[in-house]
Amino acid sequence: MKFLIVFVALFAMAVARPNLAEIVRQVSDVEPEKWSSDVETSDGTSIKQEGVLKNAGTDNEAAVVHGSFTWVDEKTGEKFTITYVADENGYQPQGAHLPVAPVA
């Protein structure tokens, strides 16, 4: 009887284990003044970005990154995407599900 209880408990734990996402595609290109990366996982998550070093070698040197990331809500199946720019003005995300500040 104890064996059956332990077996059922272990089986329940194995079935309840969350599925881990695997990387299905990964591409990157890194150069001294620009870079890009593209990653996609088996659960529908993807991340893409491109960056460039602006004004390299000067006092005004800054990285400018354009990118996006997407994920799928496990419970609802809804797909979310954020696109963004990150530069000397900060991180500026946009997405259909994000609130928009009113125009002053």
Curated annotation (Swiss-Prot):
Keyword Transport assigned: no
An annotated Gene Ontology molecular function: structural constituent of chitin-based larval cuticle
Claim: Signal is one of the keywords in the record: yes
Gene Ontology terms describing biological process: chitin-based cuticle development; larval chitin-based cuticle development
Function: Component of the cuticle of the larva.
Keyword list, A-Z: Cuticle, Signal
One Pfam short name: Chitin_bind_4
Domain of life of the source: Eukaryota
Organism: Drosophila melanogaster (Fruit fly)
PROSITE patterns in UniProt: CHIT_BIND_RR_2 (PS51155)
Signal peptide start-end: 1-18
Gene name of the record: Lcp65Ab1
One cellular-component annotation, GO: extracellular region
Matches recorded under InterPro entries: Cuticle_Struct_Prot (IPR050468), Insect_cuticle (IPR000618)
PANTHER family in UniProt: ADULT CUTICLE PROTEIN 65AA-RELATED, CUTICLE PROTEIN
Domain Chitin-binding type R&R, residue spans: 32-102
Protein name: Larval cuticle protein 65Ab1
